[in-house]
UniProtKB/Swiss-Prot annotation:
PANTHER family: SSRA-BINDING PROTEIN (PTHR30308:SF2), TMRNA-BINDING COMPONENT OF TRANS-TRANSLATION TAGGING COMPLEX (PTHR30308). Disulfide bonds: none annotated. NCBIfam families: PRK05422.1, smpB. Keywords: Cytoplasm, RNA-binding. PROSITE patterns: SSRP (PS01317). One of its GO terms (cellular component) is cytosol. Pfam families: SmpB. One of its GO terms (biological process) is trans-translation. Belongs to the SmpB family. This is SsrA-binding protein. The keyword Nucleotide-binding does not apply.
Amino acid sequence: MTKKKAHKPGSATIALNKRARHEYFIEEEFEAGLALQGWEVKSLRAGKANIGDSYVILKDGEAYLFGANFQPLNVASTHVVCDPTRTRKLLLNQRELDNLYGRINRDGYTVVALSLYWKNAWCKVKIGVAKGKKQHDKRSDLKEREWQLDKARIMKNAGR
């Protein structure tokens, strides 16, 4: 008999969109389900997903994830046509959809995918209402991050 693998608490994340946090101010985050096909679930379990260029479009009262790339596995069904970049419907409550509509109608706001993760047996995507950063904002964030690292390094060495 084989032993079940121990579930690590930090291993539920499938994919992160680090570029979104660099290029946007994230104002509010939502959790949404994804309407997936069978081969997509298999590729997600194998960790073959990329949401680096993905964004959310609200159309006809529904939300869709564009630009997410789920690479199909070689062992996936041969009778199913696998489109890695197809648009996927996001599963949100009507109240959440109305909230998103109201927020992105303002100038300069958009909705981006932040992370893709497992919650129990369900695949969820964390989306955020975002406003684009200017170049000087990105530079100041970089300086702040470097200062935090230097500060931590100084505090670590001060205790010796």
